Each structure stands twice: as structure tokens, then as C-alpha cells.
Amino acid sequence: MTYRPSSPYAPPRRSRRPSLPRPPRRPRLTRRGRLALLLGAVLAVAVGVGVPLLLTRDEPAVEPARTLLVPEGWRARQVYTAVDRALGLPEGTARKTATAPAAALALPRAAGGNPEGYLFPATYPVTGGTTPQGLLKFMVDTAAKRFGAARIVAGAKAQGLSVYQTVIAASIVQAEADNPEDMAKVARVVHNRLARGMALQMDSTLNYALGRSTVDTSYEDTRIRNPYNTYERKGLPPTPIGNPGDQALDAVIRPTDGDWLYFVTVAPGDTRFTADYARHQENVAEFNANRGAERG
């Protein structure tokens, strides 16, 4: 599906373990950083934005078509790097542009000026006249239109969340789900744990805090003092941990019915959801065995 927003420029996983012995590596309860390593699978579902705008000067009559793809789940820093490379600018230019007051990005007040979560995943046109400010502004404007749709606003309210909280939850679902089919189940786990006052304990939030992407989380990682450590802090993290797409957002406002509190991807394509902690521990043991075999 290709999304073409209107433009005036357009031409004609898991629970706390207080009683368990300290393991050498923290068992993985949720899907984590594989997304950044599997971008190729994401490209097929990226939303296309085929509007030739973002210009500040006249363009040549004929110019080779170029595009910038922002895959679902990319973090802001990844988007900034891609923008700099696409426009041939020094590294850090897009980041500085995004945080400058002159950028005038249409972010919600709750974002506190942080564009994370609002750099909408899509395919954007790039020309010789494209500027980082114009490109980032178009990403944010696109996100604002998508997230501000009546069904999203109503769906967020039905789940007891603000739209910004919904984007935060969607960014977690985007990072944790092993595949799109699991997103609505992962979203249900998030909702169930929030409703019970349980810490989310999502490894994807730790990865964000530590600026990495990995499938291994140590016990020490879960003890870091950081607002994105959802092992130590209850509730949602303060901001999105990436830029979610439509499927993750839809999963949060329309989660699958279920009583699940835990999940673990024991192998690619095999994610186990359960409300029973003992059963979950069995699944975790299988995951650990598989990881051990991978390491040799």
C-alpha cells in the first residue's frame, strides 16, 4: 500500500523474578533487537510517500529519481544518519536540524521536542533541492496526520491511553514482535501487564537505553538506572523507542483477546504466549538451549 498524503507542493516480554538465583545471562522473555538486523524484511511493508516536495529552490527539468526509505522500527538516530547520507551532508546535520527551534516540527506537547516515534516510516522522494529540515518536517507531518486520524484517537481512548502513549506502546510492539502476525498478541501482553501494575520488563527498552540492538540481555543490564529500564520502572518508557508503522499502531488499539502475561520467541517464527509462569519458564529454557546451540 502506498500512502500519498495531500500536499500543497504536489504537481498534477515477561515478569520480575525476585526469588530466582542470579543467572549469568538474563533469560530472554521478549523479542529484541533483531529488527535492525532484518531491515530487508521490513522494506516490503514500508509505506510509500510519493510526493515530490521539500524544495527550497528551483530544480532541474530532469533529475534521476531518488528516494529515502525509513523502515518501520528505525530509531531517530538511524533516520538522521540516513538523511545525512542521502543528502550528502556532514554527519550530525539532520540531528542538529531536528532539535533546533527553527525546525518547527509539529510534535505533540508530550514529546518535549523529541521527534522519536514521529519520523514516520515511509519512502520519501529526494531531489537536489531537498533539505534536512524539509524532509524531517514532512516525516513528522505525515506521522501527525496518521496518528491524529479519528480511528486512532478513538482507539487510544478505548484502551485508556493518550495518542502519544499509544505511539510509545506501538514502538515497543514494533521492536518486540517476531513477525507482524504476532503484533496484536504482543500488544495484549503490554496492556495486560500495565493493567495489573506489572513492570513491562521489555528488553527492547533496555536496548534503546544502551544504544544497541541485541538478542542477549544480562542480569546487570536489567539493573541499570535509566528511565527506559522497564525492569526497574513500571509503566511505559518516557518516549517511543523507535518509529512504529501502521501495523504496530493498529495492534495497540485493537489487541488480540487473551490473558497472556509472558512471551518468548524460542526460534524464528515460533513465539510462545502464556499466562502461566511455570510454562513460560519452560519456554525460556528452550530459548536458552537454542541460543547455546547457536553459539556452539
Model-derived segments and their meaning:
Residues M1-G33:
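Terminal targeting segments of Actinobacterial cell-envelope proteins
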